């Protein structure tokens, strides 16, 4: 399959049923759901309030990723998963991480990781990368999976 260059504006207008392999020629903002836990927590920590419980156990957060120029984006053929615009890439920059429960930004006291692979970590300011399966007929394969829209990532 031929790779096509895609910029921010073209990406925003990419149709849900338009599968393909694209090469980013601009910084493109996308979203991914992750799990986070406070690295300062240990099993002897006592809880004084509901707020402290949320500060330690907050499994669901949203990562705002920025796909850099030159990164590959795979838009799979439409199926149950891709009806939500689920795509994947080989490289992304972590811009910010926001807790779903209260919309607070995550700081360095948290470890955030992929919902599929807990060893794949996300930290604000870091660049993440992985091997990418470019087969557009497959959905749940290697790559950094993401959504165009934050609400779709939240509902995943």
From Swiss-Prot:
- Pfam families reported in the protein's UniProt record: DUF5758
* Protein name listed in UniProt: Uncharacterized protein L223
**Which source organism does the UniProt entry give?**
Acanthamoeba polyphaga mimivirus
State the family named in the UniProt similarity comment for this chain. Answer: Belongs to the mimivirus L223/L227/L812 family.
InterPro entries from the xrefs?
DUF5758
Starting at the broadest rank, the lineage of the source organism is: Viruses, Varidnaviria, Bamfordvirae, Nucleocytoviricota, Megaviricetes
């Amino acid at each position: 399959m031929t790779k096509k260059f895609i910029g921010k504006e073209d990406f925003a207008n990419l149709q849900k049923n338009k599968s393909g392999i694209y090469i980013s020629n601009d910084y493109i903002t996308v979203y991914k759901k992750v799990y986070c836990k406070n690295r300062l927590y240990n099993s002897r920590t006592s809880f004084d309030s509901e707020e402290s419980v949320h500060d330690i156990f907050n499994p669901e957060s949203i990562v705002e990723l920025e796909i850099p120029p030159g990164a590959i984006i795979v838009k799979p053929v439409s199926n149950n998963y891709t009806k939500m615009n689920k795509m994947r890439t080989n490289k992304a920059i972590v811009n910010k991480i926001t807790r779903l429960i209260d919309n607070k930004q995550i700081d360095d006291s948290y470890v955030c990781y992929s919902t599929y692979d807990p060893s794949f970590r996300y930290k604000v300011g870091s660049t993440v990368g992985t091997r990418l399966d470019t087969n557009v007929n497959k959905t749940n394969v290697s790559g950094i999976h993401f959504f165009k829209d934050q609400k779709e990532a939240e509902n995943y």
